[in-house]
Every structure is written in C-alpha cells, then in structure tokens.
Amino acid sequence: MKNILYSGKVRNIYEHEDNNKLYIETTDRLSSFDKHICNLENKGKILSLICVFMFNKTKHIISNHYISHINNILVVKKCIPFKIEFVVRGYITGNTKTSLWTHYNNGVRNYCGIQFPDNLKKNQKLEEPVITPTTKDIEDIPISKEDIINRNYMSQT
C-alpha cells in the first residue's frame, strides 16, 4: 500500500497505484462513544466481510464503491464520502453523554429533528423505530434531516 491519506477511529485509507481507486483498511481498533478502547483480534477482517456482504447484497438497489477485498483491506473506487452516520433506535436507553436517554433525561424533546413526548421511561420501547443521524467526524454530532440538506451533506432529490 502507498501513502496513508486518512486515519479514522476504525479505518485507514491509503493511496492506490491506480489514482481512481483507494485501499480501505479496517483495523482491529475498537471504538465506542468517539473513543478508542482497545484492539480486538480479527475485528477488522470480520467488519470487512460484513461490508463486502452488504455491498454485494445491495448493489442492485444502489451502486457502491466496492471492487474487491483481501482479508481486512477493501479496494474501492475513489469517490466523495457521505459523512453522515445513521443509527436506528428501538428503545430510549443509554448512559453516556451521546445516548438518546441522556439527552432526553436532560430535557431534550427534539432530538435529530424527532419530537419525543414527555414521560418516557429509561429503556422504554419506542412506538416505532427512529433514525437518528450524526455527523461522521472526530466527534459525532446529532443532526436533523433538515440540517443534512441545509448544510449540503446531500440534496433533497
């Protein structure tokens, strides 16, 4: 692999010999709540195989950047990344500063553009699953659907 272009919480991106491609290395680094916790043997390989499975399973729905892989290294088409992470939540739970319950317990009723009612209890099942997007950066910040569009992460079309 050539020069490293980016080192994230879990993945590293390297130049490829072909300027239209990149290498994405999924490491064994375990990250939680925007912090590196430890290394977990074979985590990178397993995550890469899950990605390969999902890219292949969904390519008939939407094109993706996947070309090939060897162990924990993907070869991908160079493209512009979509720096939004989507979390699907079925319960109002958690105990960290980033958890839905922590925000709710501190009085936040509009989270990621979703209005939550009063009187929810910790660990309560939500009436229906909700999607709570966050920015993908050093620190993941909650963002609403409207802000995703207004900040030009994506268009409405």
Task: Describe the function of each predicted region.
Residues 1-137:
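Active-site loop/lid in soluble adenylation, ligation, and acyl-transfer enzymes
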Residues 126-157:
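A short mid-domain helix/strand-loop element embedded in enzyme catalytic domains
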